[in-house]
Swiss-Prot record:
Name recorded for this polypeptide: Uncharacterized HTH-type transcriptional regulator RP497
Keyword NAD: no
DNA-binding region in chain numbering: 30-49
InterPro entries noted in UniProt: Cro/C1-type_HTH, Lambda_DNA-bd_dom_sf
Residues of the HTH cro/C1-type domain: 19-73
Single GO term (MF): DNA binding
Listed transmembrane segments: none
Length: 130
C-alpha cells in the first residue's frame, strides 16, 4: 500500500508544480488565480505544494484559467518517477526573472527586454526601434 501512496504523492506533486510554474509564467499571483477558480489563495498553495489533492473538476477550471488543455498537466508524467532536484539554481533564476519582468508596467519596456533575450538566445537580431 505504501508504494501506491508514493506514486499518488508524486503525481500530485507533479501536477502541483505544473500549476505553479504555469501560473508564474502567466504572471498571475496566487490570489488572482485563486479568485478565478473560486478557492482561497491558501487552498491554491496547498494544491501547488501537493498538500491537498485537486479534483478533476477543479483541475479543469485551472486549465481554463491558465489557457491550457487539461492534458498539459499530465505531459511528462512518465518522467516524474525519475529522481529530480526540487529547484536548481537555474530554475530559481528563471522564476526570479519572471517575477521581476511582471513588475515592469511599460509594455514597450517589456517588449524591449523580450527582444534583448531573443537576441541573446540567438533567435533574432536586436531591434532598436523600441
Amino acid at each position: 500500500m505504501g508504494r501506491k501512496n508514493d506514486i499518488i504523492q508524486k503525481i500530485d506533486s507533479f501536477i502541483g508544480q505544473k500549476i505553479y510554474s504555469l501560473r508564474l509564467a502567466k504572471g498571475l499571483s496566487r490570489q488572482q488565480l485563486a479568485e478565478v477558480i473560486d478557492v482561497t489563495h491558501q487552498q491554491l498553495q496547498k494544491y501547488e505544494k501537493a498538500i491537498n489533492r485537486i479534483s478533476v473538476g477543479r483541475l479543469v477550471l485551472i486549465a481554463e484559467a491558465l489557457d491550457r488543455n487539461i492534458d498539459y498537466f499530465f505531459e511528462g508524467l512518465e518522467e516524474a518517477n525519475k529522481p529530480q532536484p526540487v529547484h536548481t539554481q537555474h530554475q530559481r533564476m528563471c522564476i526570479e526573472v519572471s517575477r521581476n519582468f511582471m513588475k515592469i508596467n511599460s509594455t514597450e519596456e517589456q517588449q524591449a527586454i523580450n527582444n534583448l533575450v531573443k537576441c541573446l538566445a540567438g533567435k533574432e537580431k536586436l531591434k532598436t526601434n523600441v
